[in-house]
Amino acid sequence: MPQTDKQVCIPPELPELLKQFTKDAIRTQPPDLIQWAAEYFGAMSRGEIPPVRERSEQIPLSNWAELTPELLKVLHSRVAGRLIIHADELAQMWKVLNLPTDLFNSVMNVGRFTEEIEWLKFLALACSSLGVTIAKTLKIVCEVLSSDHDGGPPRIPFSTFQFLYTYIAEVDGEISSSHVSRMLNYIEQEVIGPDGLIKVNDFTQNPRVRLE
């Protein structure tokens, strides 16, 4: 095989392009991610606007149920506390609730999930299709995960919140890890009480907590 001294140059803007691609994929929820990716990068190479679907265009088909926090809570209850769930089993649960197959496939593709799925990560990405911002997404996740039945504000263990916020921020790609660390340190030291729980209001109503 002939040798060559030619080097492959990676453009410095590639990491940002990939971060934006991930966000646009979550927003668009294409049924065929590979085909959509080809169209996406093809449009960018031609200097055209990539085929990103806006939230207002995401109208569910009449034969599918619309994804809601309530349905995600039902799904979470059926996962029954497991941290890992098999893809086929989760797909069947999703199908029983009559939720859109293309959305399931999109979450699977964006999360790069295989046969064994980390449930909290899947749930976080599913919630991100409903939440406009990271704070809104985390609010929905808290509502889904909260097991309080006394009518109080939704709350979850801070350790769970820490895991979810770190993961969602990583997928989003626009928030530095140092900012995430600062916010988590502040919340842990100044907000979290002896019970170790975080309430939705702790990160949506506190002016010193800016998750984005």
Curated annotation (Swiss-Prot):
Homodimer. Interacts with AKAP3. May interact with SPA17. Interacts with RHPN1. Interacts with FSCB; the interaction increases upon spermatozoa capacitation conditions. Interacts with CFAP61. One of its GO terms (cellular component) is sperm principal piece. The modification Phosphoserine is found at residue 56. Transmembrane segments: none annotated. InterPro entries: ROP_DD (IPR047844). Sumoylated, sumoylation decreases upon spermatozoa capacitation conditions. Residues 209-212 are annotated as: Interaction with RHPN1. The RIIa domain mediates interaction with AKAP3. Belongs to the ropporin family. Testis-specific. Present in the most inner parts of seminiferous tubules (at protein level). Residues 12-43 form the RIIa domain. Important for male fertility. With ROPN1L, involved in fibrous sheath integrity and sperm motility, plays a role in PKA-dependent signaling processes required for spermatozoa capacitation. 'Ropporin' comes from the Japanese word 'oppo' which means 'tail'. This is Ropporin-1. Gene3D superfamilies: cAMP-dependent protein kinase regulatory subunit, dimerization-anchoring domain. Signal peptide: none annotated. The gene is Ropn1. Disruption phenotype: Mutant mice are subfertile with normal testicular morphology and spermatogenesis but moderately impaired motility and increased levels of ROPN1L. Double knockout animals for ROPN1 and ROPN1L are infertile with normal testicular morphology and spermatogenesis but defects in sperm morphology, thinning and shredding of the principal piece. Sperm is immotile. Keywords: Cell projection, Cilium, Flagellum, Phosphoprotein, Ubl conjugation. One of its GO terms (biological process) is cilium organization. It is found in: Cell projection, Cilium, Flagellum.
